[in-house]
Amino acid sequence: MSSRVLTPDVVGIDALVHDHQTVLAKAEGGVVAVFANNAPAFYAITPARLAELLALEEKLARPGSDVALDDQLYQEPQTAPVAVPMGKFAMYPDWQPDADFIRLAALWGVALRESVTAEELASFIAYWQAEGKVFHHVQWQQKLARSLQIGRASNGGLPKRDVNTVSEPDSQIPPGFRG
C-alpha cells in the first residue's frame, strides 16, 4: 500500500512513546509522522503549530472582503415537479418529458443540440396516442429522444421543406460559367 507522508520528520511509535517531548522539539515545523509496523500511523503535532494551523484555517474561512452578493443570485428557481403516472401508462395529451431531457438523452446515446419543440412533441404525442401502447415514463422519453434523432437527421439537420411551396429556378450563374 502506498502512502504520502506530509512532513520530512519521521519517527517510530516506540521512540515517540519513549520521549515525545524531545522528538517534537527536534521536529522541523512542529510536526512529525509516526510510523508503526513500517507504515504511517498518525501525525504528532506541537501545541504551537496546532495554534498556527487553527488560526490559518479561521483566517481562510472568513470572506476576503465585506462585500456580499445577494443569495438569490445563486439560487436556481425550483420548478414544480410534474406528476408522472407510476408504472406503465398510455400516452396522454399533457405528457411532458423531464426538465433535464437533453442530459438524459445524452446518457442514452442521443446527442440533441436543442430541446424538443412544441411541434415535435405534439407530433410525437399524437402518433403514440393513436397507437395506444403503454410504457414507463423513462421509456417514453427514450422513444422521444430516438424520434427526435431520426427526424432531425433525415434531412441533414435542416428543417423539412413545405410541400406546398412552389420552387423557383436559380437565376445566378456560378463562377467559371458563361451566361
From Swiss-Prot:
BP terms from Gene Ontology: DNA replication, synthesis of primer
Family: Belongs to the DnaT family.
Presence of the UniProt keyword DNA-binding in the record: yes
A Pfam family the protein falls into: DnaT
Protein name: Replication restart protein DnaT
Organism whose genome encodes this protein: Escherichia coli O1:K1 / APEC
Region (Disordered) location: 156-179
Function recorded in the entry: Involved in the restart of stalled replication forks, which reloads the replicative helicase on sites other than the origin of replication. Can function in multiple replication restart pathways. Displaces ssDNA from a PriB-ssDNA complex. Probably forms a spiral filament on ssDNA.
Superkingdom classification of source: Bacteria
InterPro entries the UniProt entry points to: DnaT (IPR020917), DnaT_DNA_bind (IPR040480)
Complexes and interactors: Homooligomerizes. Interacts with PriB. Component of the replication restart primosome. Primosome assembly occurs via a 'hand-off' mechanism. PriA binds to replication forks, subsequently PriB then DnaT bind; DnaT then displaces ssDNA to generate the helicase loading substrate.
GO cellular component: primosome complex
Cross-referenced Gene3D superfamilies: 1.10.8.1180
The gene coding this protein: dnaT
HAMAP family hit by this protein: DnaT
Keywords: DNA replication, DNA-binding, Primosome
